[in-house]
A protein has these predicted regions:
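Phosphate/adenylate-binding "loop-and-lid" substructures adjacent to NTP/NAD/dNTP-binding pockets
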Residues: 1-146, 166, 185, 191
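A short acidic, often aromatic-flanked loop/helix-cap motif at beta-alpha or helix-coil junctions
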Residues: 84-87, 164-165, 214-216, 245-246
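Short secondary-structure capping/junction motifs at helix and strand boundaries
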Residues: 96-100, 179-180, 238-241
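Hydrophobic pocket-lining residues within nucleotide cofactor-binding pockets
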Residues: 103, 211, 252
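Covalent nucleotidyltransferase
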Residues: 111-112, 116-239
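Acidic carboxylate-rich catalytic motifs and surrounding loops in phosphoryl-/glycosyl-chemistry enzymes
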Residues: 157, 239-246
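Single conserved hydrophobic/aromatic residue that forms the stacking wall/gate
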Residues: 247-255
Length: 255
């Protein structure tokens, strides 16, 4: 019975993932998807039965649009999830942790060489994404040139602010001809458009949340916080955050 349930969940979740990642038309809420995903993960741990196409084994659905594919030498992995305070505290113990706002958009990677933007791409499945360089000029806040000659690779979120989404959502349609349900899918449809004209005027913004390569000249090059703050000198903003270092882990009651 558990194996049959696993197969059904894998089929169901992959259908949801396809609609979300490749059609910009979600079929269920994030909360419902997370509930089914957590059920699948628990059943897999209980039974030891994991299908090769299980969504627990991949970051995202493989892109199937006409955009050129981009391989990520450093995989763009997603974060682990937890609903338990105790698990979060155990993870934090003995290391600096950055707490960031979760932006509702599309993970994007920018590559700069000799002070110029040479490529922008989506995360895709974490290992292979899509080239969206042609749409970057339509973004509101991405520098095309920066005062930094060394190679720089940063990741962040491409998104549309809520007030702009509310203002624009009734005037545009998704790939299925329906109104966009949320800002994330509106941003994804805009960023992954084949024609840059479709991205212009949609108020797409980018905020970095990590430096994958470069910024080794900052005072503390091993500190993500220090590198993010260093980006401000190059004309970037960054996703708001605060850092915390926990040496001992208390035992709070999970709620």
């Amino acid at each position: 019975m558990s194996v049959k349930r696993i197969k059904n969940l894998v089929k169901q979740l992959n259908e949801y993932r396809h609609a979300y990642y490749n059609q910009d038309a979600p079929l269920v809420s994030d909360a419902e998807y997370d509930r089914l995903f957590d059920e699948l993960k628990e059943l897999e741990e209980q039974t030891g039965f994991i299908l090769s196409n299980s969504p627990t084994q991949t970051v995202g659905y493989y892109p199937v649009s006409e955009l050129a594919k981009v391989t990520h030498p450093i995989p763009l992995l997603s974060l682990e999830k937890t609903k338990l305070i105790s698990e979060l505290l155990d993870f934090m113990k003995g290391q600096e942790v950055l707490f960031m706002l979760k932006l509702d958009g599309l993970t994007t990677k920018l590559i700069y060489e000799d002070g110029r933007l040479i490529q922008a791409s989506t995360r895709g499945d974490g290992e292979v994404g899509e080239d969206i360089t042609h749409n970057i000029p339509a973004f509101l806040n991405v520098p095309l040139t920066i005062p930094h000659k060394e190679r720089l690779v940063i990741t962040g979120e491409s998104f549309i602010p809520t007030n702009d989404f509310e203002r624009l959502k009734d005037t545009l349609r998704d790939g299925n001809g329906k109104p966009y349900k949320n800002g994330r899918n509106f941003a994804s449809g805009s960023v992954r458009s084949l024609d840059p004209k479709n991205c212009i005027g949609r108020c797409v913004r980018f905020l970095p949340f990590n430096v994958l390569e470069g910024m080794e000249d900052v005072p503390f090059p091993d500190s993500r916080a220090c590198k993010l703050e260093g980006l401000t000198h190059l004309g970037f903003g960054y996703c708001p955050f605060f850092s915390c270092l926990l040496y001992t882990s208390p035992s709070p009651r999970d709620s």
